[in-house]
Amino acid sequence: MQQTPLFKNHYFHQLPGFYTALQPTPLHGARLLYHSEGLASELGLSSDWFTPEQDDVWSGTRLLPGMEPLAQVYSGHQFGSWAGQLGDGRGILLGEQQLADGRSMDWHLKGAGLTPYSRMGDGRAVLRSAIREFLASEAMHHLGIPTTRALTIVTSQHPVQREQEEKGAMLLRVAESHVRFGHFEHFYYRREPEKVRQLVEYVIARHWPQWENDERRYELWFGDVVERTARLITHWQAVGFSHGVMNTDNMSILGLTIDYGPYGFLDAYQPDFICNHSDHRGRYAFDNQPAVGLWNLHRLGQALSGLMDTDTLERALARYEPALMQHYGTLMRAKLGLFTASPDDNDVLVGLLRLMQKEGSDYTRTFRLLADSEKQASRSPLRDEFIDRAAFDSWFATYRQRLMQEDQDDEERRRLMNATNPKYILRNYLAQMAIERAESDDTSALARLHQALCRPFDEQPDSHDLAALPPDWGKHLEISCSS
């Protein structure tokens, strides 16, 4: 029996003046193209919800009981400069689904049409960008990285003009909250300190209720936001993920990865990798992400300066670097198969990364193959991946000595490393092939890639081709902010 999900909209009722209430604008010929069965199950939605009879739900044409759609207003810094009001220019928060375990989840429809905050945009999304966000959301979730999720992709016959004409689409994004750093900045720069305070109180009550009545709640909360952001970015660095557009309006207050645009996972290890071809100065290059994260937190701290004094803000911000280093060290040791800490661990890691950078070694493949090394063997199967084998042998001798300090035998260490180092990541060329097929209404490549990304650490013998290195045409795909 099909059970209708229960909705409320706390944001609608508790934060008047923070949004505009409005309905989604229909897309011509809209229909459900694809959905996440795993997320649907987590949300308690049966397969009956994903039949053609329900297309009007996923396109926002038919609202479910309790939905009260609205467009949130927020501002932000783009590429280091204050940009003023930025959105939400094409996304509508439909409502908050109330789950059986007591949590609530935003249903946010991206590409839902013009809002009062659209500026020069058309309020639409294209199928290409919807598929890229869907796949990235699923990939990151199954890699264990905090992220928004994506439930459905809707395609249409509605033409949308970008660099060329493309199919209009909608994506239903699911998250515990869509509040961004830019929400707080918006009211700070409008000189509305009471609204900043109101938003902070709302967020604490909804997501940090343990501190709701604590006199130090602002400091405790902001310190936790700082640490969540640090941990998120260490996850990105460890898995080789480059976000591409770390503007303050693209930073989640919950420490989730949000707004997948011109992102990319590292192929060859290239610390200064720039995935966004609009980022001409490399502000959001892969190796600059930790520094940008802290810069963005300083902008958030500035927006909160009416609630906390300078010493309190600086105390909270000072938690960033220790959290970053501690968490990054833990994640990277695990990638190396080191489960205790030693003073020399950073030298072992840096030695391998330098070799990889020098030779352009594939980031994901190198760490995955490293698990097949044995303590007692003088050579590693990974050796054949390097041209300068003498340099690799020198590094491997140091690595073997470090492995001797670990308690795990080779089989146990291999198992633990393979549960940390994925075999399957979302390479841009794989996404592009799935997009091209889906634009012709063939979702078979999308489904196959999605299924592999849901089990990134498993061998999956039938999917080995999806772990292949990019072909020449797929090595330098240019991805822009256009979506």
From Swiss-Prot:
It comes from the Bacteria. The keyword Lyase does not apply. Transmembrane segments: none annotated. Its EC number is 2.7.7.-, 2.7.7.108. The active site is at 249 (proton acceptor). Keywords: ATP-binding, Magnesium, Manganese, Metal-binding, Nucleotide-binding, Nucleotidyltransferase, Transferase. InterPro entries: SelO. Mg(2+) binds at residues 250, 259. It catalyses: L-seryl-[protein] + ATP = 3-O-(5'-adenylyl)-L-seryl-[protein] + diphosphate; L-threonyl-[protein] + ATP = 3-O-(5'-adenylyl)-L-threonyl-[protein] + diphosphate; L-tyrosyl-[protein] + ATP = O-(5'-adenylyl)-L-tyrosyl-[protein] + diphosphate; L-histidyl-[protein] + UTP = N(tele)-(5'-uridylyl)-L-histidyl-[protein] + diphosphate. GO terms for molecular function: AMPylase activity; ATP binding; magnesium ion binding. ATP binds at residues 87, 89-90, 110, 122-123, 173, 180, 259. It holds the Pfam family SelO. Its cofactor is Mg(2+); Mn(2+). Nucleotidyltransferase involved in the post-translational modification of proteins. It can catalyze the addition of adenosine monophosphate (AMP) or uridine monophosphate (UMP) to a protein, resulting in modifications known as AMPylation and UMPylation. NCBIfam families: PRK00029.1. Belongs to the SELO family. This is Protein nucleotidyltransferase YdiU. The gene is ydiU.
